[in-house]
């Protein structure tokens, strides 16, 4: 193999790994640990999934109406089922991490550092893979 071909093959392999990992990311998005939403609701609202305490937040997980609507919730969160609230909470978690529940996120049972900014963690992993591919392609 020539001196040029070997680094090109390594770069192509690194690019393939990045592409494959990005393709699989949606397939394995739910493969990790799941939050204990009942524990978060217990902390947020005393476990009352129909909570409406007058503080501007509603439901067991204490959604603000704007957040609820932005992540696919319909109507008032306090009137939604536990399952509907959890579905919206999972979408909020994917984008905002546990920071969306600053007081009670720790009750989820998930490591806060891992779930604080999930998109940032994915970006960091991809950058590390790309950097490793670049370093591997540099002739020695």
Swiss-Prot record:
Signal peptide, first to last residue: 1-31
Disulfide cross-links: none
Induction: By the metal chelator phenanthroline via Rip1.
Pfam families: Transglycosylas
Biological-process GO terms, alphabetical: negative regulation of gene expression; quorum sensing; regulation of cell population proliferation
InterPro entries, per the entry: Lysozyme-like_dom_sf (IPR023346), RPF (IPR010618)
Molecular function terms from GO: hydrolase activity
Gene Ontology annotations for the cellular component aspect, listed alphabetically: extracellular region
Gene3D superfamilies for the chain: 1.10.530.10
Domain of life of the native organism: Bacteria
This enzyme's EC code(s): 3.-.-.-
Top EC category: hydrolase
Key words, A-Z: Hydrolase, Secreted, Signal
Subcellular location: Secreted
SUPFAM superfamilies per the UniProt record, alphabetical: Lysozyme-like
Membership in a protein family: Belongs to the transglycosylase family. Rpf subfamily.
Functional note: Factor that stimulates resuscitation of dormant cells. Has peptidoglycan (PG) hydrolytic activity.
Protein name: Resuscitation-promoting factor RpfC
Name of the gene: rpfC
């Amino acid at each position: 193999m020539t001196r040029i071909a070997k680094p090109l093959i390594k770069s192509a392999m690194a690019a393939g790994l990045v592409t494959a990992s990005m393709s699989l990311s949606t397939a394995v998005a739910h493969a990790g640990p799941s939050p204990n939403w009942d524990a978060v609701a217990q902390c947020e609202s005393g476990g009352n999934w129909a909570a409406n305490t007058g503080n501007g937040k509603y439901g067991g997980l204490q959604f603000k109406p704007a957040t609820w609507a932005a992540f696919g919730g319909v109507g008032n969160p306090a009137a939604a089922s536990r399952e509907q609230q959890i579905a919206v909470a999972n979408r909020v978690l994917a984008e905002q991490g546990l920071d969306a529940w600053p007081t009670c996120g720790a009750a989820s049972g998930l490591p806060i550092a891992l779930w604080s900014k999930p998109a940032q963690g994915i970006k960091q992993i991809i950058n590390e893979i790309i950097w490793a591919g670049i370093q591997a392609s540099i002739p020695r």
